[in-house]
UniProtKB/Swiss-Prot annotation:
Disulfide topology: none
Source species: Mus musculus
Subunit structure: Monomer. Homodimer; disulfide-linked. Occurs in both reduced and oxidized monomeric form. Oxidative conditions increase homodimerization. Interacts with CANX. Interacts with ATP2A2.
Keyword Transport included in the entry's annotation: no
Protein name, entry field: Thioredoxin-related transmembrane protein 2
A Pfam short name: Thioredoxin
Compartments, as annotated in UniProt: Endoplasmic reticulum membrane; Mitochondrion membrane
Cytoplasmic side: 126-295
Chain's role: Endoplasmic reticulum and mitochondria-associated protein that probably functions as a regulator of cellular redox state and thereby regulates protein post-translational modification, protein folding and mitochondrial activity. Indirectly regulates neuronal proliferation, migration, and organization in the developing brain.
Residues the record lists as Phosphoserine modifications: 211, 243
Length: 295
């Protein structure tokens, strides 16, 4: 099942994935990921390259290069076990392929390694990952409107994502959150987002750290009556996020979306938006920072 699940997900995501891969960021990233393969395999480029093969063939991998590529494959398979979307799978392949390419180029010639590293740095500085642009029922807040909206009508339940555009985890979660908003948004249950990378005072007020070391992005908070009820991921005593997978199933279960949606629809049909009693989250123990290790 560990092998079949990603394959099934890939088949169902082919149309969306093809549009995603057709963007310049992905095309350039793919080119950088196979750069060593092209240099090593394509004549006349490969003809003058050094090699450790016994037959002296410069246009084929030597045993050490094969070992590095096999190690890359093992790392990608391990990392992709926790990936939720196809974009995450492809992103992991791109990232670790570039690392392997850098090692292979430095091993081949330090000048080629420095050139490849320079190209990667230029790519990171000039090309940004494609943002999700699909359909959604999400209201975007700034540092002033978030408090006003949460307090404006306390009968409305809000689920707010605190995100930053530079975070790969936030980008991977974007289509999942958009799908949830399409399924569950109604008059009494609304979805919102606020960019804490841009509005840093919001991150301070709602205690969402933007440091990559804390791994708190993205953060989902459920507000009822203008007050926080549930937050994921939870935070341990050292201020680090407790490992939690941002899958559609986990969000639905932890935030009781089915119950919230049915209750909101019932109140909407009856014309009675009375105060909703808070939904109790599933009991979860936050481990001490002394013992918790990121999975």
């Amino acid at each position: 099942m560990a092998v079949l699940a990603p394959l099934i997900a890939l088949v169902y995501s082919v149309p969306r994935l093809s549009r995603w891969l057709a963007r310049p960021y992905c095309l350039l990233s793919a080119l950088l990921s196979i750069a060593f393969l092209l240099v090593r395999k394509l004549p006349p480029i490969c003809n003058g390259l050094p090699t450790q093969r016994e037959d002296g063939n410069p246009c084929d991998f030597d045993w050490r290069e094969v070992e590095i590529l096999m190690f890359l494959s093992a790392i990608v398979m391990m990392k992709n076990r926790r990936s939720i979307t196809v974009e995450q799978h492809v992103g992991n392949i791109f990232m670790f392929s570039k690392v392997a390419n850098a090692i292979l180029f430095f091993r081949l010639d330090i000048r080629m390694g420095l050139l490849y590293l320079t190209l990667c740095i230029v790519f990171l500085m000039t090309c940004k990952p494609p943002l999700y642009m699909g359909p959604e029922y999400i209201k975007y807040f700034n540092d002033k409107t978030i408090d006003e909206e949460l307090e404006r009508d306390k009968r409305v339940t809000w689920i707010v994502e605190f995100f930053a555009n530079w975070s790969n985890d936030c980008q991977s979660f974007a289509p999942i959150y958009a799908d949830l908003s399409l399924k569950y948004n109604c008059s009494g249950l609304n979805f919102g987002k606020v960019d804490v990378g841009r509005y840093t005072d919001v991150s301070t007020r709602y205690k969402v750290s933007t440091s990559p070391l804390t791994r708190q992005l993205p953060t989902l908070i459920l507000f009822q009556g203008g007050k926080e009820v549930i937050r994921r991921p939870q935070i341990d005593k050292k201020g680090r996020a407790v490992s939690w997978t941002f899958s559609e199933e986990n969000v639905i279960r932890e935030f009781n979306l089915n119950e919230l949606y049915q209750r909101a629809k019932k109140h909407s049909k009856g014309g009675d938006m009375s105060e909703e009693k808070p939904v109790d989250p599933a009991p979860t123990t936050v481990p001490d920072g002394e013992n918790k290790k990121d999975k």
